[in-house]
Each structure stands twice: as structure tokens, then as C-alpha cells.
Amino acid sequence: MSFYSNLPSAGQSSRGSSTSGRNGVGLEPLYPTIFEIMSSQEIDSLLPASIRYLLANHLVANFPNRYTLRLNKYFFEWFQAIKGFVEWYHLKTYNSTFIDRFYGLQLFSSRDRNLALTQCLNPKGQSEWPQGLQLNQQQKSVIFLEKIILPYITAKLDEILEKISMNNIFSSDETENKWPKRAFLRIYPFIKKLLALSNLLVKLLFLTKRTGSVSLLQYLFKIEYTTVRPLSSELSGLKETKGMDNRLRKTNISSIFALMQGQLSIIPRFLTFMGSQFFPTFIFVLRVYQWWTTQDMTTKLQKRVNDLDEDIPRPPFSSHSDKTEDKEGVSEACPVCEKTVQNPCVLETGYVACYPCAISYLVNNEGHCPVTNKKLLGCTYNKHTNKWEVVTGIRKLLI
């Protein structure tokens, strides 16, 4: 992941851009490469599909009950709820989303342009991120809306659009009370394409290093991308007094508790480090596992297709059919009248006979084939007329 962070920015050598400030230096050194952002967005979109794949193929398939089925049915709802808590924690703590943080990405507020330019010019700006460039509450809410709420609403609207489209295909009646559905079919795809085009234009501006935003909402609310930097605290004065008191402390319960708390504070940092190492590995293993299972399923399907292509054995024939097959010219003669077939039809057993002969024979012989003597499924007995009837036992041939 750190490979992309070490790539030189294409806009660092450009001068006189719209983001330029003092001495011709702009905000280009702050922006990451487009590869980092696209990789992060791709993983963010693949993560729910991968988790649902594991849930459906292992938990639901091995333990099918009403709880696991409901868990799979309402997957998008509870997954978005959990993701919302995780994303809000990371936005509040790190000014970054869960996936972006593992790619070394961070969001900052570009409303104070002079402070951002000072951060580029000041060599010490690489050490910590000032409070004025951190996201405010409104900008964090916008990112939460873009990452959590809007994808959920879009997914539900896509489902409604698909249902309405399918209903219009299979139902031809159009009444006046369906005008909201017709308006939705016209307006929603147009708005969706318009937003996609707007996001594409913002990405083109990002490629030209005119902005650090990659979406329309980020561009409107002055939210831009940068690489991860430590955030400065509002109470930075406490850092100067920390560690100055080297006097002996009293060994009472409070001091012992404070000492243990200080020693245990390393656990969250350790868990964060392990998570940063485990998450990329988990994503890689998950993709390999999906590829492996897909290849295995493809092999099984190909094997089944090959088994179907094998020669199908002929069905067993009765002694009467064997005698009939030995007769000369049986393939061109009707098995009932033993003459040349006129007005041909085919029976369920695959043999051809004259249509009048076949009807007469089947009715008088309780629906049995004249060649194999097998009962035809298309011949039924009518209890009202006390006669056998040919329903679907034969088919006319057009020659």
C-alpha cells in the first residue's frame, strides 16, 4: 500500500495552476495519486460483496434456518449500520474512512487556503496536521452521507426501478394512476447519469491537479484528499508539561491504577497495528479464495456438461419391437397398417405412424405404443365416456 504513497505527484512540477499560491507553489504536493484513491474505492465496493459471498456459501448453506436466512435477506441493512459506526469513528478520530486509512489516505478541509499553502511551504508541516485543516462537523456528516446513506438509498431505488421495469414488460395495461411510476422511470435514471457525469468531471479536475476532491459533494464542501499525517490536538500545551514531573509518586490505589492504565494504553495501538497488517492480507486471501471456488465450480459444471455429451443408451425394447425391427422396410412403413406412412405423426416413444392409424390404435389398446407396447403418458381414460382419449400422446409432422 505504501508503494503508491511514494510515487511522485504529477502536479508537483506544474506551475501557475488554479491552486497556486505564494511563489507559484500550490496544493499539488498534498494530493495523493489517483491509483491510491481508485484502489481504495474498489476495495470499499468489493468488501460487502465478499462478506455476503462468505455468508451465503458457508453460514446459510451449512446452517439453513430462519435466522440465517433473515441475516442474509437483510444483509445490506445491518452491514451498512455496522459500517456506519466504524466509518464515523474513523472520521471523528482520524479524518479518514476505514478503507482509506489502510491505504494511507486522509481527508482535509481546504476552506482555509492560506493555511494549506503554509503547510506546503513549511517543512515542519510534514510532521503534524494543524487543527484548521481538519474536517469540521458538517464535512464529516457529508462524508458519512456519501459513504453510508447515499449508497443505501441508491441500492433501494435501483431495486424499485428494476421491479417497475419488469412489471411494465409483463403487463401491457397502462392507466392514468401510474403516472408517478412513469415519472420515476424517466427522472431517476437521468439524475443518476447526471451525478455520475458530475463525479467524472471532478475526477478529471483531480487528474489536472486543480482540486483534491474526487466527487461532487467533496468539491462543493471543500473536502480534499491527502496522505496520512498525525493530527494536532487542541490542547497541544499539555504536551510540553508531559513528562516534566519526575518526582517520586505515592504508591496508593489511584497511582497504581493510573500506572496500570498507562501500561495498558499500548493495547489499542497494538490492535490497530495488527489490524493494519491483517486487513490487506484478509482482502487478498478473500479474493484468492473466491477465484479458487469459482474455478472449482467451473470445473464441476464442465464435467457435468461432458457427462451429458456422452452417448445415451437406447431404451430396452420388448420382444414384439425386436421382431418388428427385423422386418424389411419397417422404417418406411406404418407399424399399425404396415403400409407407407400417410399423414405422418410421431408418438411419445419416437416412432412414426399414420395419424388415423395411431389414433385408432391408441384408443382401442388403452394407450399403448404399437411398437414398444409402452403406456403413453398423453393417453388418459375418460370416466364419463368410459373411453380412452389421446390428449398429448402424438404430434403431427409437416413434411
Swiss-Prot record:
A zinc finger (RING-type) spans 334-373. Zn(2+) binds at residues 334, 337, 354, 357. One of its GO terms (molecular function) is ubiquitin ligase activator activity. GO terms for cellular component: peroxisomal importomer complex; peroxisomal membrane; transmembrane transporter complex; ubiquitin ligase complex. Pathway: Protein modification; protein ubiquitination. Residues 9-24 have a biased composition (Low complexity). Residues 1-24 are annotated as: Disordered. InterPro entries: PEX12 (IPR017375), Pex_N (IPR006845), Znf_RING/FYVE/PHD (IPR013083). Residues 1-33, 93-136, 209-277 are peroxisomal matrix. The keyword 4Fe-4S does not apply. Changing residue 354 to S: Abolished zinc-binding and folding, leading to impaired protein import into peroxisomes. SUPFAM superfamilies: RING/U-box. It comes from the Eukaryota. Present with 907 molecules/cell in log phase SD medium. Component of the PEX2-PEX10-PEX12 retrotranslocation channel, composed of PEX2, PEX10 and PEX12. Belongs to the pex2/pex10/pex12 family. The three subunits of the retrotranslocation channel (PEX2, PEX10 and PEX12) coassemble in the membrane into a channel with an open 10 Angstrom pore. The RING-type zinc-fingers that catalyze PEX5 receptor ubiquitination are positioned above the pore on the cytosolic side of the complex. The RING-type zinc-finger is degenerated and only coordinates one zinc ions, preventing E3 ubiquitin-protein ligase activity. This is Peroxisome assembly protein 12. It comes from Saccharomyces cerevisiae (strain ATCC 204508 / S288c).
